[in-house]
Amino acid sequence: MTLLLSCLAVAGDNYQTAKVVKWENSTYQQKKNKVGQWVVYYIQIDATTYEVARKKETKPKMQPGDTVQLDVKGNKATVINARGHKEQYQVVGQAQAPGQ
């Protein structure tokens, strides 16, 4: 499985190996008076943790401890999950570990 993910990562963009730290249910503003539900994933690369989410994803597709491939460009993130599925996410937050 790792070999498959590595081959996919080399084939295109600038993917880095990352780990899903946790996920949580959250809300986002859909319209003026309407709120939507989504799953926010916390994905860590080295000392940086990205918070990524995708509209209409209300049930988690990744679990804490999963190793994924992550490519971040601006506020967009492409994730290849542990099963090899590629999905586009929105970066909704980012944090550096203390001392970095």
Task: Name each model feature, range by range.
Residues M1-C7:
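Bacterial N-terminal signal peptides
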Residues G12-V35, T67:
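Structural detector for short beta-strands of small beta-barrel domains
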Residues Y15-V20, D71-Q100:
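C-terminal partner/receptor-binding element of secreted or periplasmic proteins
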Residues T17-V20, V40, M62:
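Extracytoplasmic/secreted envelope proteins and their assembly/folding machinery
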Residues E24-T27, A47, V72:
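Sec/Tat-exported extracytoplasmic proteins
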Residues Q29, T49-E51, K76-T78:
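Short beta-strands and strand-coil junctions in structured, solvent-facing domains, enriched
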Residues K32-Y50:
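OB-fold (S1/OB) nucleic-acid-binding surfaces
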Residues K56-G74:
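Short nucleic-acid-contacting surface segments enriched for D/E, G, S/T with interspersed K/R
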